[in-house]
């Protein structure tokens, strides 16, 4: 991992210098150099420092993001938001001062005209309703008069029928009496002839 990516200053080079290799005497008068522990640990310490700076130290990344945000907001945009807000303020002021009063006046004039038309239409409808009500009342009165006349005619008819029925019943009773008398006389005459 050594040499890959940026290392934070003071971190990767913070390894302590280690002593140079020591020479050891071995049997047989051969001198052999044994590498010192510090020389083996230096690359490991350097790699650990780089890993630490990449995983745990986020200051360089955050500082870069902050610089980018400030640059984007202040330098690139400039006074664009301020100009937009000033244009909105100007538009609102013009609307409040010029357009809104004109709209109110136009609406007031048109609404008065519409109100007058509605009142005229309402009066006309009211008159039509009164005429319709009068026609219905006259028609209902005619129907009531016709109903009363029909009831009177029916009562007269029923009375006439009753009197005619009584007359017919009386005639029938008289005819029955005549027939009884006639048959009784015929029986008497027949009884005279039977005795012979």
Swiss-Prot record:
Pfam families hit by this protein: Muted
Tell me the protein's name. Biogenesis of lysosome-related organelles complex 1 subunit 5
* Assembly behavior: Component of the biogenesis of lysosome-related organelles complex 1 (BLOC-1).
Residue stretches spanning the membrane: none
Query: Per its UniProt entry, which superkingdom is the organism in?
Result: Eukaryota
Of the GO CC terms on this record, one is: axon cytoplasm
Q: Which UniProt keywords apply?
A: Coiled coil
Function as written in the Swiss-Prot or TrEMBL entry: Component of the BLOC-1 complex, a complex that is required for normal biogenesis of lysosome-related organelles (LRO), such as platelet dense granules and melanosomes. Plays a role in intracellular vesicle trafficking.
Classification via PANTHER family? BIOGENESIS OF LYSOSOME-RELATED ORGANELLES COMPLEX 1 SUBUNIT 5
This chain is encoded by the gene named BLOC1S5
The record's Gene Ontology biological-process terms are: anterograde synaptic vesicle transport; endosome to melanosome transport; melanosome transport; otolith morphogenesis; positive regulation of pigment cell differentiation; vesicle-mediated transport
Coiled-coil segments = 103-196
